Each structure stands twice: as structure tokens, then as C-alpha cells.
Amino acid sequence: MEIFPAIDLKEGRCVRLYQGEFSKETVMNEDPVAQAIIFEKFGAKRLHIVDLDGAVAGESLNLSVIERICKAVRIPVQVGGGIRSLVAVEKLFSVGVDKVILGTAALYDKTFLEEAVLLYKEKIIVGIDAKNGFVATRGWLDVSEISYIDLAKQMEKIGVQTIVFTDISKDGTLAGPNIEQLELLQKSVAIRLIASGGVASIQDVKKLNDMNIYGVIIGKALYEKTIDLEEVLEVTKLC
């Protein structure tokens, strides 16, 4: 199983939100580049970065920070948040990003998504963020009428190879991942799944590993030290 330490960017800083609420932010590190270096130092093999400002604005607003992170570490970096054009995708690849995560665009601009998948294949990941089972977009501010299962099936038909699934109600809560929704997703599509939201303990990670989930994104648990990065990397390596 792949472990993705998370860095959420807001106004150039590394923050964590509670259940996706922008008003409930906690600054975890004033210097996201330093945080990325720390994660790499403790053994991380890849990083997951979200441009929260970009997710709301519809364009990358932390590109310079993302570029600095890519230059500062030697591990692959995947980035999501506000990426809604091929130009934006190409710009991220040009500064060293390894994979790009499309969210809102996957729901509202299928032509762009299809072009991106055709051009970049497995380098394009789709992020599906769900609130009460329905897909949320534009920085989780809007909730659509499409279920996360239906969108995942559409993504599979288009040729998307990896999905990041987030249950918003679990995000930043340390309440454990939504196993039920993940199991349903596994039964519905044959795409690689990266679980995000609520992971609080080594036991949570083991449970996801036992389900053969491809990867897990860990944020608050690393910052709050309820999960030790070196330990979880060792555990998943042995499983």
C-alpha cells in the first residue's frame, strides 16, 4: 500500500481543515517546503498536495510554493486543487509535479478530462469528494446531485486509472475512514483507489491495507502524531 503524507496549501502555508470548512483551519506549518522535506526525511516515498485556494478560485494560486516543494524533494509529488484546463495541467508538470488530480473538472468538463487522460494517461488522477454520498465540487462548497458511485463509473469508462476518494464528513476529524463507502466503491469499479479522510491510527491503515486499497492519504494524524510516519511505512511494507 502506498502512503501519501498530505500538505494542504492555503495562503502559502500548510494548513488542515475540519470537515472541509475553510473557517475551521489550523496552521500546521508556516513553511510547506520545510514540511515536505520533513516528510521525505522520515521516509515518505511520495507526497499529496492540495491547493485549497486554487480549489475555490478555479486556478492554481500556490504554484510558486508547489514548484519550490518539487525542487526541494526527490520524491514524486501529486497535486490537486483548481486545475481546470490543459494549460494548468501542463504548467504543473513543467514545474516538476508527477501526477495531477482533477476534481471539479471531472464532473463539469468531460471534454477537458478526456483530453487530459488521452495525453497524460495514468498521470491524471480524479479526486471524488463526497458529502452524504453526493459529489462535492469547487473546494467542497457546492454539492451536486450525482452520487460518488455514478461518477466513479463514468471515470472508469473514460479511462481514468486512479481515484482519490474523500468522505468530507471524515476529513480532519480523526474519526476513521468511511469503510462502508470504500467497500461499495471497490465493488462498483475496478480502478485503483486512494482513500482520504479520517485516518487516525495504524489500525485504520491496516484495515485499508486488508481491503487491498491501493493507497491512503494521511494528514491530520501525522501532524497530531496519532500516526508515526516511519512506523506506518514499515507496517505497510511488511503487510
UniProtKB/Swiss-Prot annotation:
The active site is at 8 (proton acceptor), 129 (proton donor). Pathway: Amino-acid biosynthesis; L-histidine biosynthesis; L-histidine from 5-phospho-alpha-D-ribose 1-diphosphate: step 4/9. HAMAP family: HisA (MF_01014). Coiled coil: none annotated. The lineage of its organism: Bacteria, Bacillati, Bacillota, Bacilli, Bacillales. It comes from Bacillus thuringiensis subsp. konkukian (strain 97-27). One of its GO terms (biological process) is L-tryptophan biosynthetic process. The keyword Lyase does not apply. Keywords: Amino-acid biosynthesis, Cytoplasm, Histidine biosynthesis, Isomerase. This is 1-(5-phosphoribosyl)-5-[(5-phosphoribosylamino)methylideneamino] imidazole-4-carboxamide isomerase. It is an enzyme of class 5 (isomerase). SUPFAM superfamilies: Ribulose-phoshate binding barrel (SSF51366). It holds the Pfam family His_biosynth. Its EC number is 5.3.1.16. It catalyses: 1-(5-phospho-beta-D-ribosyl)-5-[(5-phospho-beta-D-ribosylamino)methylideneamino]imidazole-4-carboxamide = 5-[(5-phospho-1-deoxy-D-ribulos-1-ylimino)methylamino]-1-(5-phospho-beta-D-ribosyl)imidazole-4-carboxamide. InterPro entries: Aldolase_TIM, His_biosynth, HisA_bact_arch, Isoase_HisA-like, Isoase_HisA-like_bact, RibuloseP-bd_barrel. It is found in: Cytoplasm. Belongs to the HisA/HisF family. One of its GO terms (cellular component) is cytoplasm. GO terms for molecular function: 1-(5-phosphoribosyl)-5-[(5-phosphoribosylamino)methylideneamino]imidazole-4-carboxamide isomerase activity.
